[in-house]
From Swiss-Prot:
This is C4-dicarboxylate transport protein. Keywords: Cell inner membrane, Cell membrane, Membrane, Symport, Transmembrane, Transmembrane helix, Transport. Responsible for the transport of dicarboxylates such as succinate, fumarate, and malate from the periplasm across the membrane. GO terms for molecular function: fumarate transmembrane transporter activity; malate:proton symporter activity; succinate transmembrane transporter activity. The keyword Nuclease does not apply. Disulfide bonds: none annotated. GO terms for cellular component: plasma membrane. It is a multi-pass membrane protein. Belongs to the dicarboxylate/amino acid:cation symporter (DAACS) (TC 2.A.23) family. Pfam families: SDF. InterPro entries: C4_dicarb_transport, Na-dicarboxylate_symporter, Na-dicarboxylate_symporter_CS, Na:dicarbo_symporter_sf. The chain crosses the membrane at residues 19-39, 55-75, 90-110, 155-175, 199-219, 232-252, 343-363, 366-386. It comes from Rhodospirillum rubrum (strain ATCC 11170 / ATH 1.1.1 / DSM 467 / LMG 4362 / NCIMB 8255 / S1).
Amino acid sequence: MAFVVPAAPPRTPHKFYQILYVQVLVAIVAGVLLGHFYPDLGSALKPLGDAFIKLVKMIIAPVIFLTVVTGIAGLTDMQKVGRVAGKAMIYFLSFSTLALIIGMIVANVVHPGSGLNIDPASLDAKAVQTYTSHAHDQSLVGFLMNIIPSTPISAFASGDILQVLFFAVLFGIALATVGERGKPVLDLLNPLLQVVFRLVAIVMKAAPLGAFGAMAFTIGKYGIGSIANLAMLVGTFYLTSGLFVFVVLGLVARYNGFSLLALLRYIKEELLLVLGTSSSEAALPTLMEKLERAGCKKSVVGLVVPTGYSFNLDGTNIYMTLAALFIAQATNIDLSLQDQILLLLVAMLSSKGAAGITGAGFITLAATLSVVPSVPVAGMALILGVDRFMSECRALTNFIGNAVATIVVAKWEGELDRDRLALALKGGGKALLPLEHEAAIHIPSKV
């Protein structure tokens, strides 16, 4: 017997200050300090964070398209695409619903809004008018219809993840079905994907600057002190999200044969980037590359990760039920079990109908409350000031949930190289090239 070990070029050790996650961490701390002591200057640095997010969004569509097309085109069994998508949706719906239920249970146990005694009539509904108007524009049917792009060009021009994914899946299937005639196209797309991933690496060099600007703006504009009045809600949300990640996702990871803590260490650069920018999209391209390096088949990564960004928003779901019950408790509205079940059912639907929108968490909450008559939509004004501080936690939880989901679905489908995963999670991931592009050496095993 023999096994194959990926060969990698020797790597020159980086000095600690050259490591990306160290640079991002320093940038976050510097942004907090600047925003706190010089709030006007901090607020003025918003363009740094915005520019970095735009740079990342510029390359998301090409990464998704090329990853999905080359992954699907390399399959010989087209039914496998349907199986992967079906298993991913089962996972997404199960854990998204569980996240909603956990948020509701914690809110009923902790009562973060009790004692505030807010009169609903005193709330300023105009403060959340922008979000509620966006919420009314969203519907489940409209969301599903919007997945189909008007043209392939419009999908790339708008940067809509699901539209690009939809076109990429169809293109990949078509390319696979033409057989040898499609090989020249595939031979062009594979090296092009490597060029795009190199572009990702170049863009990531600006990550510390983006994280610095985004964090300086957040602290400068809203101030750390703005958290104090609603500290119970913020603290409860962070603790609940931590419970979901380390207990629920930790058990899922353990059951499927890998360590959650090891996975978090493996994607630590991406986690710090998400923390600094409050955007899980900022780290989408590098997450896809790392999961492929860790042994997940390209076709699975290309389908599960982009879909999860719209259907597997665990952090957003926890936030929705927790925030809705907080508003009810703060305004002394007693929700019956029937009211809470209605809230849960509406949230299950609206979390899909408003997915993928900028500020999705707050807009989705508005969409939910506009349907549930018991909780005043104007109550969202209570949490408007601290929502920005909860967005980091939402983004981190969503991001970790999608990383775990991809590995689990790959394992279910038999498309996970466990040896590569073990090596990556032990710290050897950076020495691995993606499966389709690595050189290999043949080592005889002991008899």
